[in-house]
Structure formats: structure tokens, C-alpha cells
């Protein structure tokens, strides 16, 4: 590899916006490395990072409120380009001598059209339409109450709307730019081109961050880190651990041992599929532990969702610890930690979020496990992990499957988990997913699954009355899984799935469809 793929980089300072990670993903998609830090980072950390440019992201606070977040002063003296987005533009304006006024119910939320004024590097050769006066018009997405009322000295207006005098501003000499809208969201039609102008033309970055270069870099770093030692990996068959396995195989070959723990809470035939793909097809060395009885025994009588998650996590760690001790030469433990995990566990450098559900795979490994940690995905977002998985030869169908919770069916069987319930649920879920594929809807929705409800309902089969279990179909559409709407599937499809489940699975008498959005509901039931 000729160039260091981390050498040219952008720093994004987060002020709490729900879109901040989206900015980082857009910059990565352009082909440039970036990191996401909290707004209150130390000046020395920025100096050490030495970014080619800095982006000040949005946030829910008001610049006019006492004690609201501010960018470190060094941002404006570092001599690198700066782009302020929404709150980022407002705090930049205020900190450099402009002023911001509190919105009095007249903010802009949703679609807006801005008119470009004059020539700016940020909007160069970009337009969605042309005004009668010849100026470019751009379709953008606004989300602000406060607004800049006076811009700092040296700045000019480069775009406005009918109600927002300073929709975008620039100090071209210092290469400081501010936009009141969100270029990172898809509703801003030319947003990707604006970010590309900033990162490549204004900051001067090259596109070194590609799937092939990421793989090459990860393999080289793991070879240097691991040397001739052996590595152990908990392989679940999910996206992250699967991609880690393929990267490690490329880096160290048969010095990798995978431990696959079948907890009895997987999807239909999933355990066999994992062994067939990674053991037989890719030739990985896998220890297959069938622990269904052990997991179900430990969960017997437990109906609290959080307690179930903790039991599943604890038993997995116990089994993994037992197996790792048998591998006397293993000096390293590999994990599928990805960048959003790093951001969250930093507590995060990006604010304080309430723990809604515990994640069984974050932390929790024994303190006495004397192994080094190998985390080749810790810089990557999920979409990047999937792309390098494709490059490594993993099948599209596996990489782009809908999300499956770490505790598996343990949180899709409501209440106490029993083998009978899991077996019924597995078959019902397989029918639902099969029919979505047949209808060419599987990849058009974001997540679909079946939930087992611990209630019986009266049904009629032929001339006989039956009293059997109820399941719920759940199908949602979302961009970021932070919010979601229930999928408006065709009634005929829902009816067909229901008929198949009731007729083909002895033990289920009723099928319902969940029409709850997020919020107020969560996507998973537990």
C-alpha cells in the first residue's frame, strides 16, 4: 500500500445532532477517513489529530442559552477549512463576532429551496433549478428554530431563502463555511456534492478510503500486531464476526480458531448454515458448541427481558471462557466491535444517552482472560463492514440480511423461553421471510420478523376446536433505526402468510400484525 489511508482526514465535532453519524458516513462514502469527537475535546487532541478540515455538526441546544456548547477556539486558528452545519454554523457565527437570535416559532423545518448568491467553492457548478435572475436554486432540508441575525466580519452570504437571510455563509479567504440546512441527509438533493466540494476541493483530501484499501490496511496491521501467535474468535454468523473471521483468515490463515456457540436461539437451520459456509466452504477452523440445553435451563422460569439478556450474555461468556482455556496457544481475542460501539462506549464523547436495552456483546468478558484484543472493525460503520465483506467474498444474502438481536429468539419469545416456543417461532419466522422474498419486498423493508406471544387463543380446524399460541408479524421501514414506521404490506400478503403459518404449524392458532411505530414502541418487542 503506497499511502497511509488515515493520513488525510476530517474531524467532525458533535453537538448532539441525530444526524452526526450520518455526516461521518457521507464523508467515508466520498472516500476520506474521518473521526467523530465531542465538541468539548481538548485543543491538544485536535493538534495531535492534525485534520485537513473540521466539520461542526448540528445539535439540539440553543446558542442563545447560557452554558450551551461552543467549539474549541483552536478550531478557528488551526489554519484548516471549517464547515458549520446548522448549530455548527450558529456557534461559529457567534464565536467569530456575529449574532444569533432565538426562534420565536418561525423556524424552518423540512423542505426548503435556497437561492445561491455569488460564487462560492462550496456550491460550485451545483444547481437543482435556476431562478429567473439566473441564480442557482437548491432543494435542501432545514431543521432549525434559532437563526443567525448578523454574520461575522469577513463573511458573505452565499445563499438565502424567503425567510432565512443567512441560509449559507462563507469566508472564502479563511475557508470557513456555514450552512443552516443539513447536506448529509438525502432530502438535500445535492448534499453529497457539497460535502465532496468541501472535503476534496477545499480541504484538498484524496480519496484513499476504499474497501480494498481498508482491507489491505487491516490485514497489514493485524499481521504486525499478532505476529506468529494464535487468535480465538467468537463466530456468531452475524455480519461483524463473519467479516472479522474473513479478515483474520487473510492475515494469519490457520492460526485462527473460531468458536461457534449454538444457543438454541438462532433462526431456522442457522447453525448448520454457519458451519457449512465457514467450515466447509471457507475452510475455517471452527469449534462447534451445541449449548441449547444449557441456555434454556439457565433461563427456565425467567420472564423479565433484561434478566433474560443478562443470562444469555453470562452463559455465552462462560462457554467461551471454557473453550478458550482449552486453546493453550491462543494469545489474542478477536471481536467484531464497530465504530458506533466505540462512540457509544466512550460514554460517549457524544453525550449522555439512557440505556434502553443492555447489549450482551459489549464488555462482559472475564477480567482474568489474559489475552490481547484484536478489533479490526473498530473504525468502521456497519455499511462499510458490509462492503468489505462483499470484497472478501461473503455472500450478499448473508451480509444484507435484516438485523437479528444478539440474544436471538430469547427476546422474540415474550416471557419465559422454552424449546417448544422457539421451535414454533423459528418455523413461523421462516415462512414470513420466505414470502417477503417471493413478493420481492424483503430488501425494500428494513426489518421483518415474527414474535411469539405467551397467550393462547381459540381457533377452529375442520370441525375441531383448538386452543393454541398466538404470534405477531413485525415489519418496519427506517433509515437509521432510531425512528421507524410500520410497513404497509399488502393485505393479501399478510393474509397469505397468516394462512400458511396457521395451516403448516401445529401449535399456532392466530396471527396478528403489529402496527406500532417507533416511537412510541421499540422495533423489537423486548
UniProtKB/Swiss-Prot annotation:
UniProt cross-references to InterPro entries, sorted A to Z: Class_I_gatase-like, GATASE, GMP_synth_C, GMP_synth_GATase, GMP_synthase, GMPS_ATP_PPase_dom, NAD/GMP_synthase, Rossmann-like_a/b/a_fold
Reactions it catalyzes: XMP + L-glutamine + ATP + H2O = GMP + L-glutamate + AMP + diphosphate + 2 H(+)
Pathway linked to the protein: Purine metabolism; GMP biosynthesis; GMP from XMP (L-Gln route): step 1/1
Binding site for ATP: 236-242
Entry EC number(s): 6.3.5.2
Molecular function GO terms recorded: ATP binding; GMP synthase activity
Entry keywords, A to Z: ATP-binding, Glutamine amidotransferase, GMP biosynthesis, Ligase, Nucleotide-binding, Purine biosynthesis
Signal peptide (UniProt feature, chain positions): none
SUPFAM superfamilies: Adenine nucleotide alpha hydrolases-like, Class I glutamine amidotransferase-like, GMP synthetase C-terminal dimerisation domain
A Gene Ontology term for the protein's cellular component: cytosol
Subunit structure: Homodimer.
Protein name as it appears in the record: GMP synthase [glutamine-hydrolyzing]
